[in-house]
């Protein structure tokens, strides 16, 4: 269950440095957050989907590693990113 192309483009436009910036940490974190939120809604209905849950845990782990990297390299950008995404960290 991936995101639609339009939704990805909107996230890249909001968090990226330009329209084609898909590799920066904040864009990757925002895309992973959108996918994680989508999958959480899926698991509320499909509680026994253990294969999908493993993929969700991989995404959460990847997002955590990217957030740790961003915090180490650019603290101000890290704080603004988690505030814009509404993450608890």
Curated annotation (Swiss-Prot):
Part of the 30S ribosomal subunit. Forms a bridge to the 50S subunit in the 70S ribosome, contacting the 23S rRNA. The keyword Oxidoreductase does not apply. PROSITE patterns: RIBOSOMAL_S15 (PS00362). Pfam families: Ribosomal_S15. GO terms for cellular component: cytosolic small ribosomal subunit. InterPro entries: Ribosomal_uS15, Ribosomal_uS15_bac-type, uS15_NS1_RNA-bd_sf. Disulfide bonds: none annotated. GO terms for biological process: translation. Keywords: Ribonucleoprotein, Ribosomal protein, RNA-binding, rRNA-binding. This is Small ribosomal subunit protein uS15. GO terms for molecular function: rRNA binding; structural constituent of ribosome. The lineage of its organism: Bacteria, Pseudomonadati, Pseudomonadota, Gammaproteobacteria, Pasteurellales. Belongs to the universal ribosomal protein uS15 family. The keyword Transport does not apply. One of the primary rRNA binding proteins, it binds directly to 16S rRNA where it helps nucleate assembly of the platform of the 30S subunit by binding and bridging several RNA helices of the 16S rRNA. Forms an intersubunit bridge (bridge B4) with the 23S rRNA of the 50S subunit in the ribosome. Transmembrane segments: none annotated. It comes from Haemophilus influenzae (strain 86-028NP). The gene is rpsO.
